[in-house]
């Protein structure tokens, strides 16, 4: 697993872990417990997070050769709303271009956890290339979720 962040956190640093926990209110022990589990998972199997801006990093990654038989996946959660408009457009353009290049031997999937267009719900959405019946960009909502992961209502 690879990822990108403008300022990746160093969870091996005790100060960083303590600071993260300080953002959780004392009356929210379930959130603190989830964060402690996430930190432990991260420390046991640290992801490869590179310091960079999202759109250029994504364009570079998606331009790399894809192994036959492997499904390339882009996953993001609650990030699009924070990207400047030009960067958001560039990232989405890279995703759509990767989808257009996908084949049955080199499929592509895009999984996003983001607000829907009218911000009435947070959707976990999967888009696949090639899609069902050979269609490109077949998309469906897998779940409706709490914005911070407190609950998930699976839809399929």
Language model regions located:
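Class I S-adenosyl-L-methionine-dependent methyltransferase module
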Residues: 1-51, 63-67
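Domain-level detector for long C-terminal conserved domains
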Residues: 16, 22-34, 47, 89-91, ...
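Short coil/turn segments at beta-strand junctions that form active-site/ligand-binding loops
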Residues: 45, 69-71, 106
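Conserved SAM/SAH-binding loop
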Residues: 52-57
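Short active-site-adjacent structural elements
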Residues: 58, 82-84, 119-122
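Short, well-ordered amphipathic alpha-helices
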Residues: 58-60, 92-99
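A short SAM/SAH-binding and catalytic strip from SAM-dependent methyltransferases
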Residues: 72-85
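A short, conserved alpha-helix within the catalytic core of class I
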Residues: 83-95
């Amino acid at each position: 697993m690879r990822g990108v962040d403008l300022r990746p956190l160093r969870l091996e640093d005790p100060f960083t872990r303590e600071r993260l926990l300080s953002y959780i209110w004392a009356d929210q022990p379930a959130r603190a417990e989830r964060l402690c589990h996430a930190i432990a998972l991260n420390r046991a199997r640290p992801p490869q997070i590179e310091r960079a801006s999202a759109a250029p990093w994504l364009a570079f990654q998606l331009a790399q050769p894809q192994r036959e038989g492997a499904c390339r996946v882009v996953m993001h959660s609650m990030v699009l709303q924070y990207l400047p408009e030009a960067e958001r457009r560039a990232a989405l353009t890279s995703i759509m271009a990767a989808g257009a290049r996908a084949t049955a031997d080199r499929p592509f999937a895009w999984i996003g956890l983001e607000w829907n267009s009218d911000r009435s719900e947070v959707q976990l959405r999967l888009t696949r290339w090639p899609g069902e019946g050979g269609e490109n960009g077949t998309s469906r909502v897998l779940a409706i979720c709490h914005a911070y992961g407190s609950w998930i209502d699976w839809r399929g």
